[in-house]
A protein has these predicted regions:
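C-terminal motif of bacterial Sec signal peptides marking the signal peptidase cleavage site
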Residues: 15-18
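Bacterial signal peptide processing site
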Residues: 20-23
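Asparagine-centered strand-capping/turn motif at beta-strand->loop junctions
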Residues: 56-62
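Short acidic, flexible loop segments centered on an aromatic residue
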Residues: 63-82
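Beta-sandwich strand segments
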Residues: 84, 140-150
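Short, solvent-exposed, Trp/other aromatic-anchored flexible loops in extracytoplasmic proteins
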Residues: 87-142, 156-158
Length: 160
């Protein structure tokens, strides 16, 4: 009897979860407080290094809690389709992000960037310098990744 009750409870829970409409994150997530620029990654092998960086928050604009919310940040040069670095960020656990709530600020930097012996400002002004863009993707629970934003990286240095 207890076993049958437990089975019925699990089936009811599974049905109620799977019947909730999926949130279209391209509309259900607002990317807020966005800033981009070139992070001073210090000196590597005797050369100055700059990497593209983004700081952002996600705001839940839907009417549902978004459990296990994640972001994938993809860096690309504006002249190429090839990925130039990426990073995966877990924003919430099973507690989710409540409707109207905002995640803490996230700062993500590419692993790849530019190195040179010039000053950082001279590197940004170099004729060989290629600008970067950043694409943000989000997913929650077992949904598919959806693009929620794309940003160009201005030629500004982010101070530490």
């Amino acid at each position: 009897m207890v076993r049958a009750s437990l089975c019925a409870l699990f089936v009811a829970a599974a049905l109620s979860t799977s019947c909730a409409p999926k949130v279209d994150l391209s509309k259900g997530i607002q990317v807020v407080d966005v800033s981009t620029g070139w992070w001073d990654a210090g000196v590597v092998d005797g050369q100055n290094k700059l990497v593209p960086s983004i700081t952002f928050k996600f705001k839940n604009a839907s009417d549902q809690a978004l459990d296990v919310l994640q972001a994938n940040v993809v860096f690309r040069r504006v002249t190429e389709d090839k990925e130039w670095g990426s990073s995966f960020v877990k924003l919430t656990g099973t507690e989710g992000l409540a409707p109207g709530a905002t995640t803490p600020s996230q700062t993500v930097k590419s692993q790849l960037g530019y190195t040179g012996t010039e000053s950082r400002q001279q590197m940004l002004a170099n004729s060989q310098f290629v600008d970067a863009k950043i694409q943000l993707f989000a997913k929650y629970s077992n949904t598919q990744w959806q693009k929620v934003g794309e940003y160009t990286v201005p030629r500004t240095i982010i101070e530490k």
